[in-house]
Amino acid sequence: MKNKKTQSPARAFLDMVLTFVIACVLFVGFRYFIRFPVVSGTSMEPTYHDGDRLAVFYTKDVKLNDIVVSWSETLDEYIVKRVIGMPGDKIEITGGALYRNGTRVYESYINEIYWNSSIEVSIDLKDDQYFLLGDNRNHSMDSRSFGAVPKEDIFGKVITCVQHKKEQTYE
């Protein structure tokens, strides 16, 4: 017969305290630093679809091509878009082609080779402004419509899609 080791009361108490601390850290992390919004609309297809649930990390530190959640004064709602222009960049859209600082930008993540060329844009971004576009360029209200987005309106960066819409449907 084996002798079963029993935990000392002090060790059991320390394990309970450690479990409580870890639970608190996770709660605070998920409550204040990570959100799980649901995509509304088709503007980010094919990357994300209407109904997809995203994990978003609260941060203002975003980089080129990051997908972010931002507040839109014009639409009076949060939007999910891709960062196309950074502070100090010159963005031009002409003839359905995108140029950043005079260089044509080719984007493998969009389906449309030619997108709505009726919208012409030329903007110099200020030190606290970003240019955001939806991946579904022909069906997106974005910086082409409402202009540059101030840094203060960016809520956070999309980490991943945690649940695709097709996984949410039950038959």
Map each language-model feature to its residues.
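Active-site loop architecture of trypsin-fold serine endopeptidases
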Residues: 138-145
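Active-site/binding-pocket entry motifs
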Residues: 61, 99, 104-106, 138, ...
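Phosphate/adenylate-binding glycine loop and adjacent helical scaffold
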Residues: 134
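Short Gly/aromatic-enriched secondary-structure transition segments
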Residues: 98, 148-149
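Protein maturation boundaries and topogenic segments
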Residues: 1-78, 90, 149-171
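Conserved, short, structured surface segments that act as functional micro-motifs
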Residues: 131, 147-148
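Structured, soluble extracytoplasmic/luminal domains of envelope-associated proteins
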Residues: 83-124, 129
